[in-house]
Amino acid sequence: MTIKQLSETLINQIAAGEVIERPASAAKELIENALDAGATRIEIATAGGGKALLRVSDNGSGMEQADLELAIKRHCTSKISDTLDDIRTLGFRGEALPSIGSVARLSIASRRVGSAGGAEIAVAGGKVLHLRPAAANPGTIVEVRDLFFATPARLKFLKTEKAEAAAITEVVKRMAIAFPQVRFVLSGSDRSTLEFPATGDDRLARMAQVLGKDFKDNAIELDAEREDVRLTGFAGVPTFNRGNSAHQYAFVNGRPVQDKLILSAIRGAYAETIPSGRYPIAVLSITLDPALLDVNVHPAKSDVRFRDPGLVRGLIVGAIREALAREGDRAATTGADGMLRAFTSGFQPGWRPSAPSAPWTPEASPSRPYQPAVTNGYSFRERPQAAFDGLTMPTARAESTPFVEPTQSEEPARFPLGAARAQLHENYIVAQTDDGLVIVDQHAAHERLVFEEMRKALHSKRLSSQVLLIPEIVDLPEEDCDRLMVFADELGELGLAIERFGPGAIAVRETPAMLGEVDAQGLIRQLADEIAEWDTASGLAAKLEYVAATMACHGSVRSGRRLRPEEMNALLRQMEATPGSGQCNHGRPTYIELKLSDIERLFGRS
């Protein structure tokens, strides 16, 4: 078979298959061109999910007629000259416009700033229809109609108009976050108008426009640098999470990317604080010398390659974990909204009490007085489990621990999480704060405290064990016993000493001392299930902290146990002193805060 040179039109159509996969790809390329031209206002209009119409208008520098003629030819660009080592623009390949023109009907009207007039060029299926002077405002208008009309086979692989429109919206959101100084407007017959006014240097304000006010209220600022690589941005508190990773945004030298290394680093940073199947919200911006970065990995320019990927990953993980630790026990502010909905969901519109309430009197109150709650120097850090030794475990009831007037030593204003006032259903602590109240899940909170103690002891190699007077025998399938014994040494590092006890049984002889009384049966069975997913001892060694979290869950104060007032206050104080105590080891919130203003809203007083 004879080798021959392909036609320019066919070459462009092949390139379009890599660069322009769908309408959103075309929108991305055109918006990048507008930003590279210095635009401060970009308007995008669509119809039919971008397949029928995609128009991008900007107020950038514009082009002369001679520039328009070159702009639709492959590898013609004003952005680079003779090297790929110092790319500082979003586009540089010179493929977008010729690729679009080869598979769609493309028209470009432009006028350079300062020029007396503009020009227009039209292309359809790779053929130039006309190039002529035209009236135009300074800037550029690129209009794409009938995308893929020249390659109808590609149309079969596109999604519904609604899905394609949503993909364009996502592209605009990413660009809007990356460039807060630019005004973006997205409109069309297939969508409601979306507008992001310019916010200048206030990046958090732009993120609030795109991600919602809740993100602004639950975001932690990041600013870290290592070996001339700088990381800035915002990350949500662990309890402010979503069911997918669509709200994770990454930018490298201002370029929106969907890089696996960065996304993996985000997951790693939140590994101990978010439940399985949930994803944090984060907006990260990495700035580094362009020479340390390869953006020419893929024609779509959505992937990048770092010269030192380990440095970048370490910077991201370290910065996020340090920021989370700095925030301490902070939890998501959205809990109050959920609580308000729960309180009000049972009332129909216009509901009113059938009769006025009787005046309050001490005799009418169901509360019974008790001694004031004070900590007396008691610390959960010193005795995380022993505080509950000897307490009874009554069945959960609706009645609460009664209330008395607080003493000066326990005034709510002195503590972020306030002073304990009651215990509900032997599981929830109600504390009064300076401006509202807090409801604490006692098991989840203590679980986190125990885990942090175990992790600290593990890192310092001082995790002591306690010998059981009578070994706990756990019956397991033989294969589970074999798996556990492979990792006996690693479990021993955590203070859990196990050995075989005949066929199908494991003997637990020592448990971590700080756990106090441990549910050894449940702990060993859960560890057996988890270890089944790991293959080597090194895999377990890397997951020792995860195992510690499992142990902490089984060694924490259980639901249904009544606490004394001083124990409740000691738990609150320890939460305030422990980083990450706003969520348990599974990522669920340990407390919900309700502001006084929220309570007043419930009673119509606002």
Swiss-Prot record:
GO terms for biological process: mismatch repair. It comes from the Bacteria. NCBIfam families: mutl, PRK00095.2-4. InterPro entries: DNA_mismatch_repair_CS, DNA_mismatch_repair_MutL, DNA_mismatch_S5_2-like, HATPase_C_sf, MutL/Mlh/PMS, MutL/Mlh/Pms-like, MutL_C, MutL_C_dimsub. GO terms for molecular function: ATP binding; ATP hydrolysis activity; ATP-dependent DNA damage sensor activity; mismatched DNA binding. This is DNA mismatch repair protein MutL. It comes from Rhizobium rhizogenes (strain K84 / ATCC BAA-868) (Agrobacterium radiobacter). Pfam families: DNA_mis_repair (PF01119), HATPase_c_3 (PF13589), MutL_C (PF08676). Transmembrane segments: none annotated. Belongs to the DNA mismatch repair MutL/HexB family. HAMAP family: DNA_mis_repair. This protein is involved in the repair of mismatches in DNA. It is required for dam-dependent methyl-directed DNA mismatch repair. May act as a 'molecular matchmaker', a protein that promotes the formation of a stable complex between two or more DNA-binding proteins in an ATP-dependent manner without itself being part of a final effector complex. Gene3D superfamilies: 3.30.230.10, Histidine kinase-like ATPase, C-terminal domain (3.30.565.10), MutL, C-terminal domain, dimerisation subdomain (3.30.1540.20), MutL, C-terminal domain, regulatory subdomain (3.30.1370.100). Keywords: DNA damage, DNA repair. Residues 350-371 are annotated as: Disordered. One of its GO terms (cellular component) is mismatch repair complex. SUPFAM superfamilies: ATPase domain of HSP90 chaperone/DNA topoisomerase II/histidine kinase (SSF55874), DNA mismatch repair protein MutL (SSF118116), Ribosomal protein S5 domain 2-like (SSF54211).
